Amino acid sequence: MILEILSMLLVSLLGVIINVYLFIRFATSKKRPFSSFHKLCLFKTVPNITICSIFSFYAVPLSIFQMTLETVPRVQNLVLSQILGGIAYPLGPFIQICMAINRFIVLFFPFAKMKFEFIPITNISILLCILLASCPVIVSVYTSCYLVYDPSILVFLPELEECVANLLLR
């Protein structure tokens, strides 16, 4: 189990360091105004930092101290697990989809003039991604179906197995 915890620590710390560096580089870029792709790259670092930080500074210490699910403070576990599994995990792929659409438009329509130049489409898409990524948290609040971190098996699981089964069957 030590090898698994050390590998989780190494990967997550490396992820925090690289993504914080990228965030700082993107945020302090002298090129203004930021392009759409630049904004998306900057924003993509946020869920990456969140995920890696929760693993580095929450999951790894709990696992190192060999805590069990019963000994971990429940509210803290619920909040951090919901941030991780309910917002940060879905947000990453949503931003990647926006990045892919952006690159598709730039590659295949390089000289096309966007009709909606005055509307900040990238900002709206980022906001939409945040709203979509928040849906699992909203659903879990209404269904009392939460994720929790179980340090004894190093994984985030649904707190009640039957609530997940009910969600899948509906």
Task: Tell where the protein language model's regions lie, with residue ranges.
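Seven-transmembrane-like multi-pass membrane architecture, highlighting hydrophobic TM helices
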Residues: 1-170
